[in-house]
Amino acid sequence: MKRISYVLVGLALSACLFVSCGEQKRKDGRTDTNSSGAISFASDESFSPIVDELKAVFEMSCPNAKVTPIYTSEVDGVNMLLKNKVMLTITARKFTQKEYDYLKGTDQLPEAVPLAYDGMALICNNKNLDSCITVNDVKRILSGKVTKWSDVNKGSKLGDIWVCFDNKKSSAVSFCVDSILGGKTIDNPNIFAAKNSKDVIEYVARTPNAIGIIGSNWLNDKRDSTNTTWNKSITVMSVSKLDKATPMNSWKPYQAWLLNGRYPFVRTIYALLNDPKRGLPWGFAHFIESPRGQLIIFKSGLLPTRGEIAIRDVDVNNKPR
């Protein structure tokens, strides 16, 4: 018998949930409604696979709407929102109290809408036999206490550990500092930032002693029609909360293990809004949290924030009956 866990979610398809209020020009010059018009919004680049999917379905459902993502870092995306360059930013944190108070003080309407749960994935080259790692070892690597694979596994001959992030100002870096290191800075000479998540994957694929840190939505990138993103050179590492990592106590960033808490590195994806008129930025953000948007998120491999979700064990026979 082989036991396989599945995540089942009760989410129903729905049509576009928002009704246009017309194109009458307002005093602020805006003509967009919650289902029509054209806007640009900011998004952390690490969420580009799921954002591209959501954009395509939203525009198909609301043919008079055009939403254009600006893929950037978490820091730059939030700053764009604070400077009123965009009214929507998709990222992995809520407003800080200082940011919220600033926007409220300028008669704005800041809102943080939870959209999905994402696992912070660790990837390594398939030549690395250490595909299981403990939370404590990840902390030691990020803090610089460990710089060689032999410090993690005495039998390893891979030499120095090189850690690659997608961007020095990305949400992945923020998560590691705030959630893994407890606010302490990353202090390892062998850590560097690439240009984006795709570059991280390519670097790890050609570097046997590397670890890449990316969002788990890249594990199921449907934009990669050639199916080359997840090639045989890449392994998704399993992470254990215990002192010693084994295949039996370590978990990958998949939906079931995000839901039941076994995978330790989980973050919430938010839509940060500053749209007091509740126009197209508001409409797109709330489409994502609607049943149809949550179904898209579920099918992408992320964990929805809304809907009834259950884990069921299913017995599968190795031999047909």
Explain the meaning of each model-derived region:
Residues M1-V19:
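Sec-dependent bacterial lipoprotein signal peptides
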Residues D107-E111:
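Periplasmic N-terminal soluble interaction domains immediately after the signal peptide in Gram-negative
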Residues I4, C21-K66, I70-V75, N79-L82, ...:
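Exported/periplasmic ABC-transporter solute-binding proteins
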Residues V75-T106, N220-D224:
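Pocket-flanking alpha-helical
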